[in-house]
């Protein structure tokens, strides 16, 4: 009997080469749900997706054996969702990923020891980057084990407060290929350890020494590094004029210097620090104690090619700002946030020299008026970012100029300003606008918002916090015109109803939804967003009394990317809270003053949410929950925040704003 030949029927995708499929995967990789759909299409796609993926961010360390068995080409492993990573878990990583792994992030993980790190270092011989920030129990013995990872190029040890010079010395000797090192808040490390690092690791390009008890002594060695590009000295109180007096260097490679919060540094010390940094591009002097005067600005003579300067919280004089504009006229970014002494005269003399300015931050510069805004608009046509929160003396007419003259704006913060609908009409001409903050803008209405909806189709972020003139009509125009919206804040816009939520459900890319203090929204509106906005990651429903279990059940079923939720002061019971356990990536939950909750229901919900990192609960529950449960959850990586606030009547927004202004300096 003849055997019948089986004819293999080729499917269309069988003709695609592996390289072409990988290109397709690169294009859809930003959306995890698309990748999942692709891999579930057929066996060959499942295998190709497994072979292609190089970056993983698992929700729990328990999943590591299964995940790493499937994805054998993993090069970047991010375990920040895993608060508890044991030595066994690190052993699994070493055995299954081995020579393939190049980057590992343990910055929010604990429970591992030197033994686990040693297995990792010996197995992952090509590891070039590891983040061990927040390992507050890490000691010198652990650092000696890290030194076994000879291929390391980037190492972060922020807040490893038990480390000393000895541990850093071990790393310096063992990891000579290091080019990026962060020791921020490693308060046990001083001049000796930093000096050893500079002597042994000649390839260092980025060095973060913020809040270390160092002096200018170790800077002599650091500034000899031929490839050093970024040096961060934030909060280094030991770096003062005396310790820098004899400093002489020629660090032509240095491009960024952060000397913010160096309280003992004046223009004399800064002159020494900048003496050989002729190619410096970015300088941060925020919260320095010295007045930014003509003398201080003169220290910038050697860095005339500077492109960015931050003077947040500093006391500045008009002469100082004028000198900065004259000496550094190539500046593209200037930040004067909370510089309360900035005046129209000073700012105008600065910006009129900066024709290339792209970013300007004048947040809380309360002395500025229309004069400054006029000068900014006329002098800086290339501006892409303008932050001017709480510039309350700026009149309504000035905002019209911003829209007419600064058409390239992408980011605009007008929180707590006098802008009105005519101002919004002008700003709608900024077609590239992606972030617009209009919180506490009491003069705007739906009419003004409709201009934004029709003109700014690229809008990604919109903040309407306490802008009480906004209703469903305005939100509807935004939802229709700004379909790429990712973040919206409508908190305390009390006329908002479910109609707005139904409109916003058309914005399928929505990730952050804040509606705190909106009494007229219900679970029906929330369900509409949950069903259609699959990327939803953060939801704030505090003080929304009509939100109940039905809304949470919808979120639990449809919003599988939800990471943070606040349901304080709502009608939610333990039924809705328990349903949240169905969301595998939920990390933060806040539930305070919800009378429908029983301690047993809260306990069950907390146990069910296995990836929980932070829980904000009412203080009364602390004595009602079993102590063993609290200890168990803390061991699992969950931190508790107990709140004892009582319900307060909401203030009228105008009265609330008046109180805020009276508190301001």
UniProtKB/Swiss-Prot annotation:
Keywords (A to Z) from UniProt: Leucine-rich repeat, Repeat
Ranges: LRR repeats: 61-81, 82-108, 109-134, 135-159, 160-185, 186-211, 214-235, 236-261, 262-287, 288-312, 313-338, 339-364, 365-390, 391-416, 419-440, 441-466, 467-492, 493-517, 518-543, 544-569, 594-619
GO cellular component entries: nucleus; SCF ubiquitin ligase complex
Bridged cysteine pairs (disulfide): none
Pfam families per UniProt: LRR_6
Signal peptide: none
F-box domain location: 11-60
Gene3D superfamilies, per the entry: Ribonuclease Inhibitor (3.80.10.10)
Full protein name: F-box/LRR-repeat protein 3
Annotated organism of origin: Arabidopsis thaliana (Mouse-ear cress)
């Amino acid at each position: 009997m003849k055997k019948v030949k089986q004819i293999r029927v080729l499917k269309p995708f069988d003709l695609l080469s592996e390289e072409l499929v990988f290109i397709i995967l690169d294009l859809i990789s930003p959306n995890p749900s698309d990748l999942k759909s692709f891999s579930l299409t057929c066996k060959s796609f499942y295998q190709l997706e497994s072979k292609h993926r190089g970056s993983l961010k698992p929700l729990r360390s328990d999943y590591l054996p299964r995940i790493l068995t499937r994805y054998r080409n993993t090069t970047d492993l991010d375990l920040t969702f895993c608060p508890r990573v044991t030595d066994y878990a690190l052993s699994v990583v070493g055995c299954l990923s081995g020579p393939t792994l190049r980057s590992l992030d343990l910055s929010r993980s604990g429970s591992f020891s030197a033994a686990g790190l040693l297995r990792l270092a010996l197995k992952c011989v090509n590891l070039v980057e590891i983040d061990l920030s927040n390992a507050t129990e890490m000691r010198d013995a652990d650092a000696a084990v890290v030194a076994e990872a000879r291929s390391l190029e980037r190492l972060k040890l922020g807040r490893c407060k038990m480390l000393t010079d000895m541990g850093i010395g071990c790393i310096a000797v063992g990891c000579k290929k290091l080019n990026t090192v962060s020791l921020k808040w490693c308060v046990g490390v001083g001049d000796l350890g930093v000096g050893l690092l500079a002597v042994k690791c000649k390839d260092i390009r980025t060095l973060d020494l913020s809040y270390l008890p160092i002096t200018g002594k170790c800077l002599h060695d650091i500034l000899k590094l031929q490839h050093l590009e970024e040096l961060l000295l934030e909060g280094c109180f030991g770096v003062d004029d005396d310790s820098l007096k004899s400093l002489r260097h020629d660090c032509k490679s240095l491009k960024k210097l952060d000397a913010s919060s160096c309280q003992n540094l004046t223009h004399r010390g800064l002159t020494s620090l900048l003496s050989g940094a002729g190619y410096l591009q970015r300088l941060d002097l925020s919260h320095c104690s010295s007045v930014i005067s003509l003398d201080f600005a003169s220290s910038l003579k050697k860095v005339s090619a500077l492109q960015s300067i931050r003077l947040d919280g500093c006391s500045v004089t008009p002469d100082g700002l004028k000198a900065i504009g004259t000496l550094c006229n190539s500046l593209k970014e200037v930040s004067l946030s909370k510089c309360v002494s900035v005046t129209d005269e000073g700012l105008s003399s600065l910006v009129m020299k900066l024709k290339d300015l792209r970013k300007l931050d004048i947040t809380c510069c309360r002395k500025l008026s229309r004069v400054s805004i006029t000068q900014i608009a006329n002098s800086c046509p290339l501006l892409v970012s303008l932050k001017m929160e709480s510039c309350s003396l700026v009149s309504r007419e000035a905002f019209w100029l911003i829209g007419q003259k600064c058409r390239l704006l992408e980011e605009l913060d007008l929180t707590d300003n006098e802008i009105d609908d005519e101002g919004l009409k002008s700003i709608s001409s900024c077609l590239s606008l992606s972030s617009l903050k209009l919180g506490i803008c009491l003069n705007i209405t739906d009419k003004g918002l409709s201009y934004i909806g029709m003109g700014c189709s690229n809008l990604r972020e919109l903040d309407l916090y306490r802008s009480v003139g906004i209703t469903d009509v305005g939100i509807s125009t935004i939802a229709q015109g700004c379909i790429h919206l990712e973040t919206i804040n409508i908190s305390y816009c009390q006329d908002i109803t479910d109609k707005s939520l139904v409109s916003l459900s058309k914005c399928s890319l929505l990730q952050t939804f804040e509606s705190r203090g909106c009494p007229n929204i219900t679970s029906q509106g929330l369900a509409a967003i949950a069903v259609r906005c699959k990327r939803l990651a953060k939801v704030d429903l505090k003080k929304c009394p009509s939100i109940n279990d039905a809304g949470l059940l919808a979120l639990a079923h449809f919003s599988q990317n939800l990471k943070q939720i606040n349901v304080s002061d709502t009608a939610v019971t333990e039924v809705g809270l328990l349903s949240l356990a169905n969301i595998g990536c939920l990390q933060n939950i806040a539930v305070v003053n919800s009378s429908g909750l029983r301690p047993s229901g809260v306990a069950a919900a907390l146990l069910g949410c296995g990836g929980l990192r932070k829980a904000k609960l009412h203080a009364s529950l602390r004595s009602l929950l079993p102590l063993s449960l609290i200890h168990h959850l803390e061991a699992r990586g969950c931190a508790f925040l107990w709140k004892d606030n009582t319900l307060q009547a909401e203030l009228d927004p105008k009265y609330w704003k008046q109180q805020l202004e009276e508190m301001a300096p």
